[in-house]
UniProtKB/Swiss-Prot annotation:
Residues 33-44 have a biased composition (Basic and acidic residues). One of its GO terms (cellular component) is small ribosomal subunit. Belongs to the universal ribosomal protein uS14 family. This is Small ribosomal subunit protein uS14. The lineage of its organism: Bacteria, Pseudomonadati, Pseudomonadota, Betaproteobacteria, Burkholderiales. It comes from Acidovorax sp. (strain JS42).
Length: 101
C-alpha cells in the first residue's frame, strides 16, 4: 500500500493540471506554431515556464485505485496487476476469465 501522502500528491497534480489545461494548451500551440513571430513564441515559452511544474500533465502517474501502486497499473481497470489477478480469480471483474488454450 502506497503512503497516503503520495496518493494525495497525485490528486493535487490532477487538480493543477485540470486548472491550467486550457492555458497550457494555448501556450503550447503558440510556442510550436512556426507562423508566429520569434518574439511571440519566446513569450509563450516563458509563459510555460512560469506555470507550476505540477500543471504539466506528463508529471502525473497512473496509480492503482485500491493500493496506490504506481507500477503495473492497467488503464482499462485502473487497478494494479496484483489486484486484477486477485479480483479476477474471485469473479469480481465481469467478463474477465483465466486464459486457456
Amino acid at each position: 500500500m502506497a503512503k497516503v501522502a503520495l496518493i494525495q500528491r497525485e490528486l493535487k497534480r490532477e487538480k493543477l493540471a485540470a486548472k491550467y489545461a486550457a492555458k497550457y494548451a494555448e501556450l503550447k500551440a503558440i510556442a510550436g506554431d512556426a507562423k508566429r513571430s520569434d518574439e511571440e513564441r519566446e513569450a509563450a515559452r516563458l509563459g510555460l515556464q512560469k506555470l507550476p511544474r505540477n500543471a504539466n500533465p506528463t508529471r502525473q502517474r497512473n496509480r492503482c485505485e485500491i493500493t496506490g501502486r504506481p507500477r503495473g497499473t492497467f488503464r482499462q481497470f485502473g487497478l494494479g496487476r496484483a489486484k486484477i489477478r486477485e479480483l479476477a480469480f474471485a469473479g469480481d471483474i465481469p467478463g474477465v476469465t483465466k486464459a486457456s488454450w
